């Protein structure tokens, strides 16, 4: 019985010690000054749309994030419905051969980036150069 008690005390000590160390470790992992000035913005929820599959109904699901300098990140959030509408239209207009290749996905990514820049220029008059990148964090095709 003393051996069991010793093992339990040791286990409890390890668990407690690990939980106390975790907050200090997490605080060191914060963003650096330059990264905090260019936040990532998830355009959630995922875009789910059908696309031209040569007569068959096919679906595309895309998760998108953009990286924007402040204060343009607030403009992206403010105009999110307009941006999402334009991207849904863009994604649904794609042909199957354009989205199944790596080059096609890259071209679509760049087109989506330019579309967001165009929208912000149109609605805010400036700030398009502050949209640094657009990333597909998930890209699923149902064929």
Language model feature labels by segment:
Residues 1-143:
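Flexible, low-complexity charged segments
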């Amino acid at each position: 019985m003393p051996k069991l008690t010793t093992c339990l005390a040791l286990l409890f000590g390890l668990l407690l010690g690990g939980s106390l160390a975790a907050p200090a470790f997490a605080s060191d992992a914060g963003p650096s000054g330059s990264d905090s000035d260019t936040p990532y913005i998830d355009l959630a929820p995922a875009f789910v749309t059908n696309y031209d599959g040569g007569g068959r109904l096919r679906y595309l699901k895309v998760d998108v994030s953009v990286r924007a300098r402040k204060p343009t990140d607030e403009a992206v959030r403010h105009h999110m419905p307009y941006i999402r509408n334009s991207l849904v239209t863009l994604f649904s207009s794609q042909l199957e051969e354009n989205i199944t290749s790596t080059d096609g996905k890259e071209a679509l990514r760049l087109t989506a980036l330019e579309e967001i820049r165009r929208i912000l220029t149109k609605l805010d008059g400036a700030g398009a150069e502050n949209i640094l990148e657009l990333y597909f964090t998930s890209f699923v095709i149902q064929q």
